[in-house]
């Protein structure tokens, strides 16, 4: 708790924006309540240890105790604390690995019909989703503009835009790697050859 309070004090030292008198009083009240609760807890602990010491003395009998310091007992308690910490740490690491395994990669399939749909596609890239874009329902000029916008956004967001079909592109975030072999795309009835530049060929 002391470490947490110290960090809170350090953070509050630098946080001077919008500080009011009420907030200052609330912080002071909280710290005084925390100090009081710590003092009460310490008193209870000392009373418990005193009670256990007196109970041990009664069990031992008339043999007087010269010192309350017991190095073996303190050593055992320290070892138990260390063991409990070491046992708790792998559990936390295991939970993180389970979360990563449970996360699934989703691929959104988009058929943009107008230039304004490009913003929706870029928004999906921002939240780290893969997007398969098919420009079959767009006019050639609009598709080129849309593709240029998406390509610029993917470069800014460190994404990747790859052509996977005659009118299809795969947009992936930086954390997704795609290995596409060279493939011959069959010519269909719709002749489209979008390129990343705005010039018409």
From Swiss-Prot:
GO CC terms of this entry: cytoplasm
Composition bias type Polar residues, residue spans: 43-54, 82-92
Biased amino acid composition, Basic and acidic residues: 27-38
Pfam family, one: SepF
Residue ranges of the region described as Disordered: 27-99
Secretion signal span: none
Membrane-spanning intervals of the chain: none
Known role: Cell division protein that is part of the divisome complex and is recruited early to the Z-ring. Probably stimulates Z-ring formation, perhaps through the cross-linking of FtsZ protofilaments. Its function overlaps with FtsA.
Description of how the protein assembles with itself and partners: Homodimer. Interacts with FtsZ.
Name of the protein in its database record: Cell division protein SepF
Organism: Streptococcus agalactiae serotype III (strain NEM316)
């Amino acid at each position: 708790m002391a470490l947490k309070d110290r960090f809170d004090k350090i953070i509050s030292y630098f946080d001077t924006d919008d500080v009011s008198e009420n907030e200052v009083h609330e912080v002071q009240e909280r710290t005084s309540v925390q100090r009081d609760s710590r003092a009460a807890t310490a008193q209870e602990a000392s009373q418990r240890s005193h009670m256990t010491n007196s109970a041990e003395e009664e069990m031992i009998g008339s043999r007087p105790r010269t010192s309350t310091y017991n190095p073996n007992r303190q050593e055992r308690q320290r070892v138990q604390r260390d063991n409990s910490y070491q046992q708790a740490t792998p559990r936390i690491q295991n939970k993180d690995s389970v979360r990563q395994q449970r996360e699934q990669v989703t691929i959104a399939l988009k058929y943009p019909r107008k230039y304004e749909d490009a913003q929706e596609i870029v928004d999906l890239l921002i939240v780290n989703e893969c997007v398969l874009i098919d420009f079959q329902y767009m006019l050639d000029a609009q598709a080129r503009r849309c593709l240029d916008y998406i390509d610029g956004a993917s470069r800014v967001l460190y994404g990747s835009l790859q052509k996977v079909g005659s009118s299809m592109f795969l947009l992936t975030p930086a954390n997704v790697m795609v290995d596409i072999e060279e493939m011959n795309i069959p010519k269909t009835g719709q002749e489209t050859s979008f390129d990343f530049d705005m010039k018409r060929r």
